[in-house]
Amino acid sequence: MSFESQNKVTVIADEKCWIEQTALDQLAVVAALPGVTRAVGLPDLHPGKTPVGVAVETENIIYPHLIGNDLGCGMGLFETNCRVKKYRQEKFVKRLGEIEALREVRIENPFSEESPILDLGTVGGGNHFAEFQTVEEVNDEETFSSLEIDKSRVLLLVHSGSRGYGDRVMDQFGDLGGIQSGTERAGAYMLSHDNALLWASRNRYTVALKLTEYLGYSSGLRTVLDCCHNFVERT
């Protein structure tokens, strides 16, 4: 089932998916912005400073405030060298309970460039997380095989973004009126945007490296996939 208004707003949802009216109202406001050709609310649509859980198509204009300060937020899935048969949840919980936050775990910057993220290797607040997982059931053998996941190993899923670096980009480019495409300012924003996406991905990797190293399983860490869900896509 979809909710449509003025041919520019679509909400993807069904009868089991309750969406706050405030979020729908915010989505309508976004759809009315100059240059917006389509605004789509996804099943996780909810209100924020701007609506969260949306995809917005624009023409000749960029709205950095719709992306917000968590540039590059996404998910990274990593395969550890911890065998499932040797995994003991109580051991991990006890060890992790000895620290209050990942910033307490010191680690060298694993990249050659200086990090613009001052607290590289931290998850952040909100709905961000790091979670150890195991494969119990495979529903798509072809895709699973293409990822070359070893079912005998523990996986680590990290949800995080560019941390304080994204805040600084937002402070500099958060024009509520938008930025015209093709301008020098648009080019400067996209340069910062792309760098934030790169370091958000690197931050997720560093979170995984920190956790596995702290727990004694740092060697053999492999990135299975890394997907960003908060960014500007050029078409």
What are the residue ranges of the model-derived segments?
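Domain-length cofactor-binding catalytic modules of enzymes
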Residues: 2-25, 34-40, 47-54, 61-64, ...
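Long, basic N-terminal domains or extensions that often function
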Residues: 100-109
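Iron-sulfur (Fe-S) cluster-binding segments and ferredoxin-like electron-carrier domains
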Residues: 78
